[in-house]
Amino acid sequence: MRWWLAGLVLVAVLAGVIYFTRPRSAATSQEAPQQASLSSAGYVDPAICASCHADVWETYRRTGMGRSFSQPVLSNTIGDNKSAPTFYHKPSESYFTMLERDGRFYQRRYQIGFDGKETNIMEKEIDFVVGSGNHVRAYLHRTSRNKLVELPLARYAEKGGSWAMNPGYDHQDHPGFSRTITYGCMFCHNGFPEVPAGSGEAGADTVFPGRLPEGIDCQRCHGPGGKHAQAAESGAKPGEIRKAIVNPSRLSPERQMEVCMQCHLETTSSRLPNSIVRYGRSPFSYRPGEPLGDFMLQFDHAPGSASPGGSYDDKFEIAGAAYRLRRSECFQKSGGALLCTTCHNPHDIPRGGEAARHYNGVCSQCHDAAVKQLAASGKHPQSTDCIGCHMPKRRTDDVVHAVMTDHYIQRRKPERDLLAPLAESHVTEDNGYRGEVVLYYPQDLPNGSDRELYLAVAQVNQKSNLSAGITALTAAIDKYRPGPMQFYLELADALRDNGQMTKALPIYEDAVRREPNSLPALRKLGVALRSSGQPSRAIEILKRALDLAPADGATWHELGLNYVDQGSKPEAIAAFQKATELDEDPEVYNSLGAVLLESADLARAEPAFREAIRIRPAYAEAHSNLGNVLSASGRFEEARYHFEAALRLNPNYAAARQNYALALARVNRFEEAQRQVEAELKSDPGNAVAHDLLGNLLVARGQVKPAASQYQEAIKLRPEFGRAHLDLGALLADSGDVAGALPHLQKAAASPEPGVREEALQTLGLLGKAR
């Protein structure tokens, strides 16, 4: 009897269960509806301004704001040499270069693959350049669906010009060619663009279908210029012409500052959130002269909070000039006299020696007498480089290759080297700030619904203060019953993130009842239903979402995952293929490959996994899945390459280690396979699957008693583990202990896994015949 049972156990070792992990649903996106018109809001082509304000127009065009966004040309991409050096990024083992072909510009990435040749090649055309070059230039690509994505390599002004990765990219698994430019990004880096109607909804897709402005224009600080231009062209009186436009210098000090603070008050660029645009406001609806708090609310870390580098109180980030200025005693005690425009003429920036004289002259208006007195007593240098000592240049915490003037006016210059190189901190959901989020601006927001609701949302929006935020947001919603659906969606998301899906699900349902045509709400409800084991209902909801937005790749992906859960593989494959046609999303390709792998369609699974890796080379799941395909196809050495890549990327990836062990067993490297499984059990002794696999490997090496112990441990950890019952039953029967084998084989025969159930029934049948 031993011959066939031993063969059964060996099949379990060599074939095994193919493990793979399907990813979470992709980020939200939305079909672009009809565009809203800037002209209807009173905006005009900013070039009209030049007809009356030619001098200001010419000087402003040379400022950083005037050059903030542009078309690619030789000078702002690869330089006059028509070539750029290849940049090697060690953490991701990737090579990047900038290319020019026939007057068009591209950014290219490649890696060195298993065969020593270039692999994972990605090349995208540069459609736009963001940044003036005073500090940094980044490069954007516009997709066929009018999304803007940031390309990984940037050009920094430091060291006379140098190439380095964009902020947030200096680590192994960076965003690659997939970082989407949001409306929040565009708000501060360019003039207002045309955007789809309904763009203010949380989770709405960020698409830019029209012609984009080239640089921050006059109307960002002066408001829509249509009425002003019309009045001037019609010969209206000077007073009427002036009244038709916002002149920031005629606003109150508070409103004047807010014109600048709409973009220069960023409390932090790391996960917090730093600001929330009020629900119901579209992303480009702020108008100079209105209270900034009517458009957005600004938030900050709680005072005294510890940061990885010390304290968040002293954070110095690239878009926080006004944030730092507001800390200064000079500002706080000026009574509104010290504004951004006290030092800065936004229309014309002084340069070189003229700049030093200008800024020092501004300081002298208040401090001249005191400085002379201190200099006479030997307590102050005779020279008056005010800025160099009291507002020194400093390397920014968030863009570590950029050096900026610190607008915190200090009595004494810090003693440390402010320009010393900094390593980029890699902030994730797992290691980000965990603490209270406080309202920063406007500080005088009165108690009531706005304060309570938005402050509660700030706690949960990026998981900074999840438990307390859930309590506060629940109470605020119960108290005020707000109209905007987004409050309910935020609460549902927070409950989901806190592992309370049972409580989240009815709130997602409520959000959809409030806005039945909200694509983000429908998709999130679909995800929640799937997580709650209701794929049929989820499919119904997701089909409603696709009726609204048939070209939404994320919804097609989620639909496919529900079909997988239902066991409807052909429908799942069709949904995933549709999603791949719409978005270049590695998770979609991995999901497609996974269901093809489950269907034993290795020929089609392999290119799907390779495409997932090409898009995201540091995708551990896709490497492991490709390793499974290659191992099953008899290409062990290449399979080993991908399994080891998966484990380098994620050393704690249990499924990859187990799959690697199975691949080693397929080529009779049982000792190596055993070491892999033992390493997994060392880090996770409670992994029942690993104990079962180790038992199979021990059987293959003739170590029957230790194998039985491993099967027993697997069953102890998971009493209903059908595969372990099958393996132990087969081993006992093979050893002649049929009585001991029968209970385990009978348990396996009742397994919900069809393969385990069929093997157990077959074995029981053979045992019956043998007896």
Model-derived features: where do they sit?
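Structural signature of tandem alpha-helical TPR/SEL1-like repeats
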Residues: 465-472, 497-510, 531-544, 565-578, ...
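Alpha-helical segment of the N-proximal tetratricopeptide repeat
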Residues: 445-479, 490-493, 497, 561
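Hydrophobic alpha-helical membrane-insertion segments, chiefly the h-region
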Residues: 4-21
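Primarily the internal scaffold of c-type cytochrome electron-transfer domains
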Residues: 30-31, 36, 55-132, 138, ...
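Residue-level recognition of tetratricopeptide repeat
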Residues: 448, 483-484, 518, 552, ...
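Conserved alpha-helical positions within TPR/SEL1-like repeat arrays
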Residues: 489-493, 520-530, 554-564, 587-597, ...
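Terminal, low-structured helical/coil segments at or just beyond the last alpha-helical repeat
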Residues: 700, 734, 740-771
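Structural marker of alpha-solenoid helical repeat scaffolds
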Residues: 479-480, 514, 548, 581-582, ...
